[in-house]
């Protein structure tokens, strides 16, 4: 490495050596914390991109290993990684898993006491937090923005990034507050992740998040572990009960209206199948409670509208009925 005045001149060989060392570090973290020998799909490319300070958009299917793409570099880099997600249940689940691995992860959500929130934010300012999970609504609070100014932020992760786009199927105005974080921390790159995006949504996500330049990584959405079956039947309810009784593990039944979720759950219960229902019209606490019941196998079937689905991580789901 040659110093020329204020400039540092690095030869290509040295740059390659540094890149290889960094790649080895990521791989070591993956092995140490998750036990996997190597990355899969586009995980490595996304991790390298965000670690180089580039705004990055990753399109990955459910089960594609999205969480690895921000958790590994967050552990490797200095500072706190801010993770924006709308799903409290997912926050709690990921924080619990990370803390079990010895990672300094915390979550801030609406039902927490103010003193507890302040303690976590102060800890983040002092460098005691590696990953900080927050809801998009939290971003625009004065309390959060004041503390954020004093944090060393490694990068910002935006999960379910399609929620920021008005072209997306699940637009959430609260996601627009992410642009305020970028004003406070312009040096922190953004990693946006989604499993659902049309070409228009892809462009809109990057524009709304203020990407310095377009930078998209795509993973194949082909799912070889899924089988798609269409059945014609004169009695859909009877056929559904037959399928649910025949298949072990958990199940999801999607219906087109909120009223139908309740009716179908009651029908299944009468047929001797444990079920609950979920839709956007329920209170947040009720939704969380029912999702937890299903996650913890207290009920077999979740009957829902398309409000249910983001961030679901349940390995024993064996059938999804529409």
Language model: regions and residue ranges:
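Helicase motor core with emphasis on the C-terminal RecA-like subdomain
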Residues: 19-20, 24-33, 37, 41, ...
């Amino acid at each position: 490495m040659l110093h020329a005045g204020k400039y540092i001149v690095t030869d290509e060989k040295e740059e390659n050596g540094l890149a290889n060392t960094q790649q080895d570090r990521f791989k070591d973290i993956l092995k140490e914390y998750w036990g996997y020998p190597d990355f899969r799909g586009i995980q490595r490319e996304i991790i390298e991109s965000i670690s180089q300070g580039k705004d990055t958009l990753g399109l990955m299917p459910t089960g594609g290993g999205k969480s690895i793409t921000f958790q590994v570099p967050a552990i490797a880099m200095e500072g706190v990684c801010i993770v924006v997600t709308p799903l409290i249940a997912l926050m709690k689940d990921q924080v619990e898993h990370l803390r079990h691995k010895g990672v300094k992860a915390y979550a801030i959500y609406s039902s927490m006491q103010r003193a507890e929130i302040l303690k976590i934010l102060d800890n983040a300012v002092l460098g005691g937090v590696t990953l900080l999970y927050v809801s998009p609504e939290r971003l625009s609070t004065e309390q959060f923005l004041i503390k954020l100014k004093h944090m060393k932020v490694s990068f910002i992760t935006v999960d379910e990034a399609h929620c920021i786009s008005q072209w997306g199927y699940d637009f959430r105005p609260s996601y627009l507050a992410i642009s305020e974080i970028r004003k406070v921390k312009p040096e922190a790159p953004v990693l946006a992740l989604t499993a659902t995006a049309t070409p228009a949504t892809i462009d809109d996500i990057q524009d709304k998040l203020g990407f310095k330049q377009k930078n998209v990584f795509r993973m194949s959405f082909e799912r070889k572990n899924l089988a798609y079956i269409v059945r014609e039947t004169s009695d859909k309810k009877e056929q559904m009960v037959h399928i649910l009784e025949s298949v072990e593990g958990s199940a999801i039944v999607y219906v087109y209206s909120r009223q139908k979720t309740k009716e179908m759950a009651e029908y299944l219960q009468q047929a001797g199948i444990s079920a609950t229902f979920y839709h956007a019209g329920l209170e947040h606490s009720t939704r969380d409670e029912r999702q937890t019941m299903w996650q913890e196998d207290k009920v077999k079937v979740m009957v829902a509208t398309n409000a249910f689905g983001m961030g679901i991580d349940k390995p024993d789901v064996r059938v999804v009925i529409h």
